[in-house]
């Protein structure tokens, strides 16, 4: 918390609703954004749209965590529609295991697709059985609560393989 507040002492001069609107990223979630927003309010006496990724109690959006991942799949569905097809039964490669990737995977599963891969900066996992809802819940807990590495998935699900230092784009899939 103290780091976020100290950071805002300098950053406040460079941001604003009409200037630049920072957002969370790797290692910076709603909690940290909340700390920074609180300090911004204290320094400026404003409650304006200066940060994205705030909690609901600070004026954040209800579906902010899901939005980008869901829209990825909405866009994909529109592309598939032009080819006269949809996601049902299609094998999908996903790069990443953070917020956007997690909710992309969730939406793919909801629409009948089969998620085959997820990754982090160390490597990727490929699950020949697919990453179902239960396995995705494990990944979400692993990444969001325990701050674990995707490699741990392969320890939990022995049929999955972990490939260190690589991206998943060379695995066979439909998407």
Locate the predicted segments by residue.
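Glycine/serine-rich phosphate-binding loop and adjoining beta1-alpha1 elements at the start
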Residues: 1-88
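Glycine-rich phosphate/diphosphate-binding loop of Rossmann-like nucleotide-binding domains
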Residues: 52-55, 60-169
């Amino acid at each position: 918390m103290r780091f976020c507040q100290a950071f805002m002492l300098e950053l406040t001069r460079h941001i604003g609703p009409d200037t630049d609107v920072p957002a969370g990223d790797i290692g910076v979630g709603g909690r940290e954004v909340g700390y920074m927003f609180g300090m911004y309010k204290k320094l400026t006496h404003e409650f304006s749209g200066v940060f994205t990724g705030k909690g609901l109690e600070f004026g954040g959006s209800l579906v902010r965590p899901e939005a980008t991942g869901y829209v990825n799949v909405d866009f994909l569905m529109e592309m598939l529609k032009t080819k006269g097809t949809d996601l049902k039964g299609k094998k999908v490669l996903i790069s990443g295991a953070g917020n956007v990737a997690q909710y992309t995977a969730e939406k793919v599963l909801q629409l009948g697709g089969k998620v085959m891969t997820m990754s982090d900066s160390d490597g990727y996992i490929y699950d020949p059985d697919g990453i179902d809802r239960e396995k995705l819940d494990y990944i979400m807990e692993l990444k969001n609560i325990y701050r674990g590495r995707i490699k741990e998935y392969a320890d939990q699900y022995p049929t999955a393989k972990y490939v260190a230092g690589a991206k998943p784009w060379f695995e066979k899939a439909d998407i």
